[in-house]
Amino acid sequence: MRMRHKPWADDFLAENADIAISNPADYKGKWNTVFGNDNPIHIEVGTGKGQFISGMAKQNPDINYIGIELFKSVIVTAVQKVKDSEAQNVKLLNIDADTLTDVFEPGEVKRVYLNFSDPWPKKRHEKRRLTYSHFLKKYEEVMGKGGSIHFKTDNRGLFEYSLKSFSEYGLLLTYVSLDLHNSNLEGNIMTEYEEKFSALGQPIYRAEVEWRT
């Protein structure tokens, strides 16, 4: 998907540096000083326009949230959404998921959310999928044993691939749903994509996995 260039994005992010952290590697091992507390940190990789993470932050004020988004033209919308929500427990980073270990110390993160990630359906693009083993290793390095991944998608192929990837990596499957919106799971915060696909009658798939302690 081609992202529309927004020439004002840099200035906007600089004006909202309290939300969009411009030098995240400087806070590696010190994110508690950014939030001013020692609450657990949950990250969303591919935070998109920010509806999910801003909603989670409002719903769970005792958890600190950090959204990771590669595209500057998208993260500006997320920054505005967080700003409008007035949630104080969420920050956003305009970085690549490959750099997670440059930004977080081992064990500094407790949970990773992956919501409607690009499925990269072609076999030659497998290594780009956020549930590929390379990325699972990144998540493990910043979470350590006991960390967990919560994963949602509308793409059945990506879901099946991810379950296999989780299993081969040795992760413990603790929850799975092939139709999330008709399940008994409470407190689900929908993303923008999720609302769109659900309105079309598309089932939403969800899995939760954790590292064995």
From Swiss-Prot:
Its EC number is 2.1.1.33. Substrate binds at K122, D154, T191, E192, Y193, E194. Signal peptide: none annotated. InterPro entries: SAM-dependent_MTases_sf, tRNA_(Gua-N-7)_MeTrfase_Trmb, tRNA_methyltr_TrmB_bact. CDD domains: AdoMet_MTases. GO terms for molecular function: tRNA (guanine(46)-N7)-methyltransferase activity. It comes from the Bacteria. S-adenosyl-L-methionine binds at E44, E69, D96, D118. Belongs to the class I-like SAM-binding methyltransferase superfamily. TrmB family. This is tRNA (guanine-N(7)-)-methyltransferase. It comes from Bacillus subtilis (strain 168).
